[in-house]
């Protein structure tokens, strides 16, 4: 059993720890959480509790196919991280660098069209309506000097 154990497994261009359970190891890939990882493994027919180091090459290939197009493999559209993409209108699940690039493009689009959210991003202020009087302060604090008596 130990002869086919791998300490590091490469899935979707990312090295994952072979000593962890597969569902937790997949969360090391940016864009994949524990719930989505469990869904992918259930669709692939892989035990989520087995160690990632015991995955075969066929199982890794199956996981990568599902990650490439999860909706086509039966994962519901509400579980993906990019439903109804702005440019294509498709339900997609982005991982690794593609996720970072898409997020950056979304913020830049909001800045370009001068949307309220884009302006808040530019100014480095909270975007989702939080209060700013006491939180989101930057820099060092300036104390109040006491008046001489």
Curated annotation (Swiss-Prot):
InterPro entries: Rbsml_uS13_C, Ribosomal_uS13, Ribosomal_uS13-like_H2TH, Ribosomal_uS13_archaeal, Ribosomal_uS13_CS. Coiled coil: none annotated. SUPFAM superfamilies: S13-like H2TH domain. The keyword Hydrolase does not apply. GO terms for molecular function: rRNA binding; structural constituent of ribosome. Pfam families: Ribosomal_S13. The keyword Oxidoreductase does not apply. GO terms for cellular component: cytosol; small ribosomal subunit. Gene3D superfamilies: 1.10.8.50, 30s ribosomal protein s13, domain 2. GO terms for biological process: translation. Keywords: Ribonucleoprotein, Ribosomal protein, RNA-binding, rRNA-binding. Located at the top of the head of the 30S subunit, it contacts several helices of the 16S rRNA. In the 70S ribosome it contacts the 23S rRNA (bridge B1a) and protein L5 of the 50S subunit (bridge B1b), connecting the 2 subunits; these bridges are implicated in subunit movement. Belongs to the universal ribosomal protein uS13 family. Part of the 30S ribosomal subunit. Forms a loose heterodimer with protein S19. Forms two bridges to the 50S subunit in the 70S ribosome. This is Small ribosomal subunit protein uS13. It comes from Thermococcus kodakarensis (strain ATCC BAA-918 / JCM 12380 / KOD1) (Pyrococcus kodakaraensis (strain KOD1)). The gene is rps13.
